[in-house]
C-alpha cells in the first residue's frame, strides 16, 4: 500500500468509532483469546517482558492490563542529579528545539501553533514563547506509562477535543497540524525553573488517556475544551517528585513537553530519531 493511500484512508476512516471499539475490546476479559493476542503482540513487536514486574502473558486478564504493565523495581533508574531533567517515557525523539514565533516543528516542512496545541489559551502560550519543546513518540513495543521529568506542582489540566489520526512518523510528515488537531490532555506544572507543559496526545486506537490524579480523562470525548485548576498551596496541592508516574496511554501515542525560555538546555544525547528511556537525562536546568 502506498504512503499516499495510507494517509488518504486515515481521512476517510471513522477514527473515533474505531477507537471506541478498540478500547472496548482491549478492556474485555476474553480468557484464552486475550492471552493469544498478547502473545502475538509480544512476538510481533519484540516486547521485552523480562523487565516487566509480571513477565507471564497469561497473568493479564485484559489486553489493556498488559499494555500498561508495570516494570520491575529498578528497571528504569531515575537520574538523581537535581539539575538534570529526565525523560518522561520510553519513546523515540520525533522533534525538539526552540519554540520560534510561537511555532513548533512537527516534521520537516511542517510547523504548528503552540497556542492551538494548548487549547487556544493565548496567555498560557505566552509563557512558553521563545522556550523549548520536545516531541516523543511511543511505539507499540514501548512501556506506556508516563512519568515526571522533574519535581513539580500541578497547576492546570486541559482536555482538548479533536481528531484521532495516527501519530506515527509517516502521518507526522503528511498531516498538517497533527498534534494540534488530535485529541489531547494538556498538563501544566510549576517547577523551580518555571512553567512546564506535559501533553498527552491521543491517536487512532488509543482507547483512553489517564492521569494519576483524575484517572480516565478520555473517553468519553466531548465537543468543548475543559479546564481544571488545582491549588498551589495548602494540603490539597498535587505535587510530584522526579520519576513519579503521572499518566498512561491505552494504547500508546505521543508526549510533548514545553519549557519556558532560558530555563533548560537539552542533553547532548538528544537527536531526532533516537530512542529514549524513562529516567535518563533529557535536559539540564539553566542556572
UniProtKB/Swiss-Prot annotation:
This protein's GO CC annotations: plasma membrane
Gene Ontology MF terms in the entry: phosphatidylserine decarboxylase activity
Cofactor comment text: Binds 1 pyruvoyl group covalently per subunit.
Coiled-coil spans in chain: none
UniProt-annotated location(s): Cell membrane
Active site: 90, 147, 253
Family: Belongs to the phosphatidylserine decarboxylase family. PSD-B subfamily. Prokaryotic type I sub-subfamily.
Protein name: Phosphatidylserine decarboxylase proenzyme
Annotated source species: Aliivibrio fischeri (strain ATCC 700601 / ES114)
Highest classification ranks of the organism: Bacteria, Pseudomonadati, Pseudomonadota, Gammaproteobacteria, Vibrionales
